[in-house]
Amino acid sequence: MTDNATILQHVPVGKKVGIAFSGGLDTSAALLWMKQKGAEPYAYTANLGQPDEDDYDAIPKKAEQYGAVKARLIDCRLQLALEGIAAIQCGAFHISTGGVPYFNTTPLGRAVTGTMLVTAMKEDDVNIWGDGSTYKGNDIERFYRYGLLTNPNLKIYKPWLDQNFIDELGGRAEMSQFLIDNGFDYKMSKEKAYSTDSNMLGATHEAKDLEYLNAGIKIRDPIIGVAFWKEEVEIKPEEVTVRFEEGVPVALNGQRFDNPVELILEANRIGGRHGLGMSDQIENRIIEAKSRGIYEAPGMALLHIAYERLVTGIHNEDTIEQYRINGLRLGRLLYQGRWFDSQALMLRETAQRWVAKAITGEVTLELRRGNDYTIMNTESPNLTYEAERLTMEKGDSMFTPMDRIGQLTMRNLDITDTRAKLGIYTDAGLLSIGQGSAVPQLDNKKK
């Protein structure tokens, strides 16, 4: 490995090394191990509003106990909320099953963490970064991209890519014993049947038992929502009104929120009471291998449903089509760790300017269990939907029966062309005409 290598495979002795520190077993053992091997560890913890984290202030103190030269808590919640709203505005969600999307909550969290922690490291003149991502997953590439995008001089050192670390502390039991042997009363928590990663926007559950497709959502304990599949869990129908102004969610049930963080947390509470936004997805990782995840995102789901209702009531068909196509492409870029790449910024600007700016109004929904809901009302000064335009009742109309006759007559041109093409395909043996064919009602007579 040359001195110019970006990825370091051995402990950088005598060098400052920043580590994304969660306070869990892996990063605690890694920090102490690096310290003992001669590195100068600096710990950086991102406050992403994780629903399963009770005491953020205690995490940097723990890092210092394990040997961190300096430990900092970086509040990333506002930036994460803004990026989440941007994803809603752009429809940046490319993974879905049965119409229920995955809201890319982990990729959004990585975009914020990767840039904000490396920025904090630069302030401390720390130019080597490590995190807990494994070589088989998506995060190792996401953090790599965002880290180098933020600091072009950054070097990467991950203990989990260092064979010496793997040989000495290759598993949870070894890491726990290592901490105990060094005087830390670390009690290894009981392993769950799956792994969970979360932030304010949502939670991801994957790996272990969830790698097997015969293990479903029911083995998992929700951390944002409720187990709506359990009959004993009482969930009463609830109406909720969501208000947008120029594409930005500003109010829930008439209560305005100046802080987007507070709005998303309240949306989580409302949607979470019903288990809204939970999904089970099979997806393609960046390396093209398939993986399976179960996701929670009640607040994102609530905002997405209301936003798309206004989109369909305000914009024309071609704009909606382009919004959806661009959203699929942008969602994939986000998933790949390219949220701040030029091609992503181009797609984001298009949606946020020409789609989102027109989205002002209120949508009222009735939430029931899981993703079962009904849209009760839609109001907006910008609606192009007008019931009177296509009313089935007798009255004034914007066009007459004769107008429609003329419009239909013009269709004769392309119908004739289509019929001719089908004849060509039939003659070429690509189509068969008659019973059981793709076009059974057509004959092969040319008229």
Swiss-Prot record:
Q: Does the keyword ATP-binding apply?
A: yes
Q: Name one GO biological process term.
A: urea cycle
Gene Ontology CC annotations of this record: cytoplasm
Give residues annotated as binding ATP. 20-28, 46, 132, 134, 139, 197
Cystine links in this protein are none
- Which superkingdom heads the taxonomic lineage of this protein's source? Bacteria
Pfam short name (any one): Arginosuc_syn_C
| UniProt keyword terms in alphabetical order | Amino-acid biosynthesis, Arginine biosynthesis, ATP-binding, Cytoplasm, Ligase, Nucleotide-binding
The molecular function terms in GO held by this entry are: argininosuccinate synthase activity; ATP binding; protein homodimerization activity
Where, in this chain's numbering, is L-citrulline bound?
Answer: 102, 138, 142, 195, 204, 206, 283
Q: In which compartments does the protein localize? A: Cytoplasm
The answer to whether UniProt assigns keyword Nucleotide-binding to this entry is yes
Name the Gene3D superfamilies on file. 1.10.287.400, Argininosuccinate synthetase, chain A, domain 2, HUPs
Q: Where does L-aspartate bind?
A: 134, 138-139
**First-level EC class:** ligase
Pathway involvement? Answer: Amino-acid biosynthesis; L-arginine biosynthesis; L-arginine from L-ornithine and carbamoyl phosphate: step 2/3
- Give the enzyme's EC designation: 6.3.4.5
Q: Which reaction does it catalyse?
A: L-citrulline + L-aspartate + ATP = 2-(N(omega)-L-arginino)succinate + AMP + diphosphate + H(+)
Q: How does it assemble?
A: Homotetramer.
The family classification in the record reads: Belongs to the argininosuccinate synthase family. Type 2 subfamily.
Recorded protein name is: Argininosuccinate synthase
